[in-house]
C-alpha cells in the first residue's frame, strides 16, 4: 500500500504544481499531449510542429542533458518517432484507461511501439557516441515519449 500512496502523492504534487505555475515545466507535458491528441484526428498532421513540441517537452523533463545523445541533434530527429506514434494501429494506446492495460491488443501495441522507438534511436545514439553502445536505449526516454504523445504509460524515472 505504501507504493500506491507514494504514486498518489506524486500525482497530486504534479497536478498542484501544474495548476499553481502558469508557465511551469509541468505544463510542457500538457501542451505536448494536447497537440498529439488533436493530431490523432487530423488527416494531415504537421509532423514538424509535433516534433518541436515533443522535443521541448523532452528537454523540459531532462532528456536533453549533457550526457544525452539527443543534445547533439535538432528536433527533427524526432520526426520518425512522431510519425510512428501517430499510426492508427496505436489508437488503442491513446489515453488508455488503467482497466484496459491488460488487454492483449494494448499490451502488444505498447510493446511494439516501445521497441520500434528503441530500434530507431539505437543507431543514432551509436553515431553520436562514435561507437556501438552496448546498453539499451534509456527506458526513461522511451516512456517519456510515450507519456507525452500517447499518455499510455508513466515515465519510468
Which residue ranges define each predicted feature?
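Ampipathic, surface-exposed secondary-structure segments
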Residues: 143-157
Amino acid at each position: 500500500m505504501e507504493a500506491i500512496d507514494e504514486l498518489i502523492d506524486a500525482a497530486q504534487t504534479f497536478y498542484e504544481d501544474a495548476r499553481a505555475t502558469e508557465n511551469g515545466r509541468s505544463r510542457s507535458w500538457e501542451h505536448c499531449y494536447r497537440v498529439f491528441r488533436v493530431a490523432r484526428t487530423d488527416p494531415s498532421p504537421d509532423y514538424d510542429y509535433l516534433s518541436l513540441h515533443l522535443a521541448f517537452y523532452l528537454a523540459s523533463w531532462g532528456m536533453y542533458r549533457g550526457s544525452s545523445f539527443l543534445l547533439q541533434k535538432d528536433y527533427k530527429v524526432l520526426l520518425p518517432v512522431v510519425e510512428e506514434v501517430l499510426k492508427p494501429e496505436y489508437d488503442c494506446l491513446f489515453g488508455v484507461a488503467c482497466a484496459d492495460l491488460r488487454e492483449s491488443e494494448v499490451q502488444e501495441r505498447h510493446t511494439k511501439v516501445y521497441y520500434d522507438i528503441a530500434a530507431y534511436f539505437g543507431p543514432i545514439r551509436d553515431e553520436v557516441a562514435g561507437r556501438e553502445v552496448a546498453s539499451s536505449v534509456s527506458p526513461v526516454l522511451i516512456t517519456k515519449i510515450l507519456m507525452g504523445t500517447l499518455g499510455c504509460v508513466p515515465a519510468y524515472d
